[in-house]
């Protein structure tokens, strides 16, 4: 595309966005602005500045690329639309890194039409104090997670609980505890509808040291779902440090679900605990 034409389209998009009341919030840890208002010219210096903002449909949170931002982003109760989603993404050169220490990094709770893309989230480690999930989505719908890297979480790299209509694509989840990617819902139901997981890699999600009565250390796990597709994904090197000899884990699998499709995937070199009696590469488990 002609560079001048591209810039013209970009400028028109920005002007149109402001005309429609869309707000942009910028975070840059290198900001030296004396009066940070979250604008591109005077960005917030830390993620803490986002805590007092009541987010609206169409808002965009821009995180400065090629730097580490410490803290969390928590978005709750935002009912955005497909035309005006709330977006969390990087800007500038490179990808932004969120270090959330012992907590989850990005939490989306009771929301609709939220997009998270082009960010890296990192916790303190599955055995070093973290108890959270990298991208944690709770009872939310029409969620898109794209080109995310998540590591260092005791629970999941990306975790979906309840809700539905979720797409997870082109993401790399590694060195987490419970699972690389998990989708789950209310026990005894198949109430989480329309899940798509594609072109993702789950590697070295070794096991959760806090779970001593069930499996942990799977690559991709889907449960309590109706209508889900997992395709063009790879799971490898997971499960080797599950802290018990019982069931699981598995590279890519599902349970208690209807209309689950796993296709064009590669699951290899996954393991169970040294005394483990179960596990596998792929599995349609109980309730399928």
Regions found by a protein language model. Name each.
Residues 4-13:
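Sec-dependent N-terminal signal peptides
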Residues 18-49, 65-67, 91:
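Right-handed parallel beta-helix/beta-solenoid
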Residues 33, 44, 62-71, 79-133, ...:
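Right-handed parallel beta-helix/beta-spiral solenoid domain characteristic of secreted/periplasmic
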Residues 51-59, 79-81:
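Beta-strand repeat architectures
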Residues 71-72, 91-96, 101, 119-125, ...:
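Surface-exposed loop/turn segments connecting beta-strands in extracellular beta-rich domains
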Residues 74-76, 99-107, 127-136, 152-161, ...:
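Extracellular beta-strand/beta-solenoid scaffold signature
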Residues 80-87, 107-117, 135-146, 162-169, ...:
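Surface-exposed loop/turn motifs in large extracellular/passenger domains
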């Amino acid at each position: 595309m002609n560079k001048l034409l591209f810039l013209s389209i970009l400028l028109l998009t920005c002007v149109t966005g402001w005309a429609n009341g869309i707000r942009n919030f910028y975070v840059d840890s290198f900001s030296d602005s004396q009066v940070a208002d979250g604008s591109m010219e005077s960005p917030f210096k830390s993620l803490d500045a986002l805590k007092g903002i009541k987010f609206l449909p169409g808002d965009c949170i821009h995180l400065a690329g090629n730097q580490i931002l410490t803290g969390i982003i928590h978005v709750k109760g935002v009912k955005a639309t497909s035309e005006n989603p709330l977006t969390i993404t990087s800007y500038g050169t490179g990808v932004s890194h969120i270090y959330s220490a012992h907590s989850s990094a990005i939490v989306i709770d009771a929301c609709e039409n939220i997009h998270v893309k082009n960010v890296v989230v990192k916790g303190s480690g599955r055995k070093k104090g973290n108890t959270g999930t990298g991208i944690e989505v709770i009872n939310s719908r029409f969620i898109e997670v794209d080109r995310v890297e998540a590591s260092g979480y005791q629970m999941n790299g990306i975790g979906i609980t309840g809700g539905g209509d979720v797409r997870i694509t082109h993401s790399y989840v590694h060195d987490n505890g419970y699972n690389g990617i998990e989708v789950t819902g209310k026990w005894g139901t198949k109430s989480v509808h329309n899940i798509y997981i594609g072109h993702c890699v789950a590697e070295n999600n070794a096991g959760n040291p806090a779970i001593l009565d069930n499996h942990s250390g799977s690559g991709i796990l889907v449960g309590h779902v109706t209508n889900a597709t997992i395709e063009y994904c790879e799971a490898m090197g997971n499960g080797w440090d599950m802290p018990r000899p019982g069931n699981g884990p598995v590279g890519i699998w599902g349970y208690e679900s209807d209309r689950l499709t796993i296709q064009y995937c590669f699951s290899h070199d996954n393991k169970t605990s040294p005394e483990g009696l179960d596990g596998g590469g792929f599995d349609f488990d109980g309730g399928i």
